[in-house]
Regions:
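Structural beta-alpha unit
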Residues: 1, 41-44, 70, 77-120
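Small/aliphatic-rich secondary-structure junction motif
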Residues: 1-61, 88, 161-222
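Gly/Ser-rich helix-loop-strand patches that form or flank binding pockets
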Residues: 3-4, 14-15, 21, 27-29, ...
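Conserved phosphate-coordination/catalytic loops
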Residues: 13, 70-73, 99-103, 133, ...
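Short, solvent-exposed amphipathic alpha-helices that sit
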Residues: 21, 71-79, 107, 179, ...
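A structural preference for short, hydrophobic beta-strand core positions in alpha/beta folds
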Residues: 36, 92-97, 153, 194
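Conserved N-terminal ligand/cofactor-binding loop architecture of enzyme catalytic domains
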Residues: 51-58, 62-86
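Conserved residues at the C-terminal ends of beta-strands
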Residues: 96, 123, 166
Length: 223
């Protein structure tokens, strides 16, 4: 059964990284269909309101809409050509663009859920925590708002096709393993590693032990 993935893109190197990674992982994860999606820029609220009253403003709004749509289609065609150059069949690539309605992250998630996609792929900007607070991040917002749609975040210079799954026995961890099983079913050419970090006593105990006391308890097997 084909797996459906949506790659949310803009005109940035981070999106280029996501497209390149998706094409590369296709070598080992077979039967994948891709949809390249671009959410168009926000249109001025003033222009939207004026367009309801003024024919001139309405004409200007139509002009802006056409420009945004043309720019989006050119961008998507460029990424489509890149994926085809990396070995993806043209029939396995669909294009989708739409005006921004709910917000960039929510529009991406709404589209992915409505289309029953198996995952969303995005390039990650790699902002620090402080930068993320002030500037925001589409990838961070997608992760924060998703409930059922798996999200793949791609960093720069991501070349490995092997997969590592960090597990801790939680429900979300089991969901990640379930998603991995779905995506890798019947593929024997991929290496999967499961990684678990054993917690220390201080990670979950509210008592403020001295470091020597903690070490002594851990040596006795209380960790």
């Amino acid at each position: 059964m084909d797996k459906k993935l949506v790659i949310a893109v803009d005109d940035s190197r981070h999106s280029k990284n996501a497209v390149r990674y998706a094409a590369g992982i296709h070598e080992v994860l077979k039967d994948m269909k891709f949809t390249l999606m671009h959410v168009q820029p926000t249109i001025s609220e003033y222009l939207l309101e004026e367009a309801k009253k003024s024919p001139q403003a309405y004409a200007e709004l139509e002009k802006v809409n056409r420009k945004n749509s043309e720019t989006a289609h050119c961008l998507l065609e460029k990424y489509k050509e890149q994926m085809m150059a990396l070995g993806i069949a043209e029939t396995d690539i669909q294009l989708k663009t739409q005006p921004r309605m709910l917000g960039m992250a929510k529009d991406i998630l709404e589209f992915s859920m409505a289309g029953h996609f198996d995952a969303v792929i995005l390039g990650r900007r790699g902002l620090s925590g402080l930068q993320d607070v002030f500037l925001g991040s589409v990838s961070a917002n997608v992760v924060n708002h998703t409930s059922n749609t798996p999200v793949w975040l791609v960093d720069e210079k991501e070349t490995s096709k092997d997969i590592m799954v960090a597990v801790d026995g939680s429900e979300n961890s089991l969901k990640a393993v379930d998603h991995l099983a779905l995506m890798t079913a019947k593929n024997t050419d991929i290496k999967i590693s499961f990684f678990h970090v054993t917690p220390k006593l201080k990670d979950f105990c509210p008592v403020d032990f001295e470091e020597t006391q903690t070490e002594a308890l851990e040596e006795q097997g209380i960790d």
